[in-house]
Each structure stands twice: as C-alpha cells, then as structure tokens.
Design a protein with these regions (language model features):
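Helical hinge/lid and interdomain linker segments adjacent to catalytic or ligand-binding clefts
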Residues: 151-229
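A glycine-rich, often tryptophan-bearing local segment used as a flexible ligand/cofactor-contacting loop or short
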Residues: 198-281
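Aromatic-Pro/Gly-enriched surface loop or interdomain linker
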Residues: 43-184, 258-260, 267-302
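Hydrophobic single-pass membrane-insertion segments
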Residues: 28-39
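Transmembrane alpha-helices
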Residues: 18-28, 114-115
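Intrinsically disordered, low-complexity segments enriched in small/polar residues
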Residues: 4-5, 23, 59, 276
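N-terminal Sec-pathway targeting helices
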Residues: 3-22
Length: 302
C-alpha cells in the first residue's frame, strides 16, 4: 500500500507570533497620519459648514470639488465665495503657530534665493471685457486689448492660493511687468517660480526660458504672446490660444508646452519632471499649497 505522507507541522508558538505581528502591522498602518482629501465630482457649489472645507474647480465644463479636513489645512484660511462664479472671490491666509517648524523647512532662505512671477497679464486677460469675452464671441477684437491692472487681485486663473502662500514663506515676488521691462531682473535669483503665467511678452518668455533654474509650478504657462503699451498702460494678444488662426495653440511654438496637464485638477499622481532649464508639474495644483505639504516641499527642494 502507498506510504502515508504527513504534511508539515506548524509550531503553535510560531503561528500565534505571526498573527500578533500581522495585527500590530495593521494597527501601525491605520495609525499613520494622512491628509484627509477627497474628490467629489457632483455638481454642487457649497462649502462644508462643519469639519471640512471645499475647494471648487472647473474641469472642461465639469465642476469638481476637492474636500479637505480643516485640521489638515496648512494655513488658517478664510474663503469668500463669489455668487456669480464657482471659484472663490477672495481668500485670507494666515500662518498657524503650530506649523512654525514646517514653514521654516519650506521657506526661501534669503531674498535672492527664489522669486515667483505673479501673472498680472493673466489676471487681466481673464477679467471683465478681456480675452475670454472675445474667445466666447461676446465681444469683438477690442477685447484683445486690456488695461494692465494697477495691483494684484488674485483669482483662480492667476494662481490665487499659491500667490498668497509664497510671500508668507519669504519668497520674493515680482510681476510680468517687472520682467518685461527688465528681463535681466531674473538673473538676480537662483530659482524662478512660474505660476499660471499663461500670457507673457516675448521678452518675458525669452528671459524665463533662458534662466537655468525655473520651477513651472502650473501647467499652461507661457502659452500665448502679448505685446505691451506702457504709454496707454495696456497689453494686446499677439499670437496663441487660437489667435490669429484657430490652428495656433502655443503662441511661441514652445516644444515644452505642457498645457495638456491643466485638466488634471485632482493631482493624485503629482510629480515634477525635468526639462532643460528646470522642472514642470504634471497636473494643475490649484489649491494644493493650502493643504499638501509635498507640493511646497517639492518647490523648495527642486
């Protein structure tokens, strides 16, 4: 008759120890602190009134909401809604005393270490009687010449949240106008941070793309060329964004244009990738400077 073969005998002690290790591992994984962020795709535009704050974006005509637990915000944030727009009308952002160590970690080290360029032309282009009124056929060619704003009025399209966060972290700031009037100004800084500077002049484009260390913190930057008239204090669309021909996309024919990433506002796989004169982000981090430590760390460390 065939010889009976006994299966391997597992020590009860080993088995019990293994179960204990599995339980401990599960507890440790569950206890790791996480930023409580979720993406809600429903078409509702209200802010949470309790423990969460809601940031709303528009993605190809579809409203997307990013929901963040208030305790995970990196700054005390007060949002004023705009009844006529899905995006906030304004924000007040202040540091949290308990995050002082983190702020020091991600702050600019000195006045010439890093500078960001505020997109003042983009702010105006998206404004009333601006370029988008022309694109939407609500206005004729006269809307392609726009007044240069006298000051910052940060909006969603002009990188509202990060343009308020970076000054709190000691980053120097200049505007499109500063670079257009004096392109060499960028040479003063080790690192240049470009936000959603969609509309820039040729002199500004050349100054940015020739700088050796640029962080393109938003996609769709350097997308269309404008021309300034400082006598009239205006700027005019020259080329790009389907103008003067619908076949024209990037007004500078820039081979590193990354506008395809601007439609990813969830940023679930956000990273910076390398190009010859710096790094670019692979999604549209609209409000991430308010709650995502890794975003601010990447800007600092890149």
């Amino acid at each position: 008759m065939p010889r009976k073969v006994n299966g391997p005998v597992v020590s009860r002690t080993v088995l019990v120890a293994s179960v204990i290790m599995i339980v401990i591992g599960a507890v440790l994984i569950a206890s790791v602190p996480r930023t409580r962020v979720s993406l809600d795709d429903t078409n509702v535009n209200t802010h949470s009134a309790s423990d969460y704050v809601q940031f709303t974006t528009m993605n190809e005509g579809k409203i997307e909401k990013i929901i963040v637990h208030k305790s995970d915000l990196l700054f005390d944030t007060e949002i004023t809604d705009d009844k006529n727009n899905i995006h906030p009308k304004s924000m007040i952002i202040e540091k949290k005393p308990e995050l002082a160590d983190f702020y020091r970690q991600v702050a600019s080290t000195n006045a010439t270490d890093a500078v960001f360029v505020y997109p003042i032309f983009t702010q105006a282009a998206y404004g009333k009687d601006g370029f988008y009124n022309y694109y939407n056929k609500d206005c004729d060619i006269k809307c392609l010449t726009v007044a240069i704003p006298p000051g910052f009025v940060p909006t969603y399209s002009s990188s509202m949240s990060i343009s308020k966060v970076l000054p709190l972290l000691n980053y120097s700031e200049i505007t499109d106008v500063d670079v257009d009037k004096n392109p060499d100004i960028l040479k003063k800084y080790h690192k240049v941070i470009i936000l959603h500077n969609e509309y820039v002049t040729k002199k500004e484009f050349d100054a940015i793309t020739s700088h050796p260390h640029v962080i393109y913190a938003f996609p769709n930057a350097l997308y269309a060329e404008v021309r300034t008239n400082y006598t009239d204090n205006t700027f005019t669309l020259v080329r790009g964004h389907g103008y003067p021909s619908s076949s024209i996309e990037n007004g500078f024919d820039w081979k590193f244009d990354n506008s395809r990433y601007e439609y990813d506002t969830a940023c679930k796989n956000m990273t910076f990738y390398t190009i010859p004169n710096g790094k670019m982000v692979n999604c549209y981090p609209a409000y991430r400077s308010l709650f995502d430590k890794s975003f601010l760390e990447m800007i600092k460390e890149s």
